Amino acid sequence: PIGSNYNKTVQLCGEFYRPPLPFPACRADDIECLRRGLRTFFVLMDSGHVGMKPIDPFLVNSVAVALPDEQMSILLRRANVTGVRWTKLVDRRFNGGKSGTTFSSDLHVTGEINVNMANRVEPFVAFLTMDIDQVESNITYPWHATKGIDNEDYILIGPERIAIRNFRTPTFFLQPNTEDTIPIDNFLLSKPSILDHMSNEITAALMHSVMDNFRLFASSVIHYYSLL
């Protein structure tokens, strides 16, 4: 299977050798080829290639939203996120020593939502299921090439900047159907910006983890396999 033999580097007759990865040979402007390469990258990531961490499912410990004017706060706890492995490459840009990538994702989120109000001792609590459709992640990062001990060129990735854009307001439903769910449901329906904020925070955390994996991948695999 992919990932079982590709993590191994051996030395033959004084030369370092790593088995080739199943990547297509892509030109920088061949977006369809790059999309196929991205799919392979996610397969390798799921398999733990070169120490990468699988991120589907992905756990976000908490997302907090403070609303001082309403004297309330919202906390989404232990959000479980799935669907990132089907992320699509929308655009790829090069600008000197910087690269830009735009992803589109459809994500499914579940977690416990707590709504705390100043006039209540106990929070409203419910289980939230949320679908984030067509969320776009615009990622830019600096990079430069370096020589490895095998005299091959590898890529070092600098800190990324991530901007998230929602094309659709996330949809949701709450469980179970109790007295607590009614005020939470009414509040989220009246303030869709809260859903957008939670969606952006979750997607940004997820994409930072994708970039952490790509950073490890790019520094371990010779440069012409770099596709992000």
Question: Which residue stretches match the model-derived regions?
Answer:
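Short, low-complexity, Pro/Ser/Thr/Gly-rich segments in the mature regions of secreted, periplasmic
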Residues: 213-228
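Tubular lipid-binding modules of the TULIP superfamily
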Residues: 2-130, 142-150, 154-156, 228
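Envelope-exposed proteins and targeting segments
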Residues: 105, 135-137
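Short linear sequence motifs
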Residues: 10, 51, 134, 207-210
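Extended amphipathic ligand-handling, pore-lining, and cofactor/metal-binding catalytic surfaces
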Residues: 144-215
